Amino acid sequence: MQRAAERGLCRLIIVNRIDAEDADLPAVLTQLQQAFGKECLPLNLPAANASRVVDCFFNPSGDSDFSSVAATHQALIDQVVEVNEELMTLYLEQGEELAPEQLHTPFEQALREGHLIPVCFVSARSGAGVAELLDVLVRLAPNPTEGNPPRCLIGEGDKAVPYAVVPDAGRHVVAHVFKVIFDPFVGKLALFRIHQGTVTRDSQ
């Protein structure tokens, strides 16, 4: 988590096995907040004996297995509006209810700045919370043009200078090779993530 923070990466925590017999989910959430800070706030909460999850951001209604959906929603709103002075003024002085659409941009900003670390509860075994997690990633997670760009350098040692990566398919390729493996039939294979440009089958 610290390494991700140092690199300016957005962070999201997934708590799996919420339906395990020995699961103490309130304690898990407390431990996460103690380890990584008060920025760790649930986007959903287990409900119906961990057979499903209840949304605490888009549609904060219903009962959960622990904690209060309304209080959790309030904590999320308070955390998100702190990064946007204009929105905070509107929220505090006028007491207006903020729609999720108004919170989308400051939510992404809070993620980029490390001011919010969402916690999502799921069960890979039963599928509880999986669809909701995918919805969160689609609707709230920054895409490459919205997130913090990777920190790249051109050159080595004292001569290295920063290079600003732009997620543009038309520019020259900038990629990060994160693993090299050897296949006895194919030979050496490099696994990489493209940050800029386009790579095709016949790229040199």
What spans do the regions from the language model cover?
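Structural and coupling elements of P-loop NTPases
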Residues: 1-204
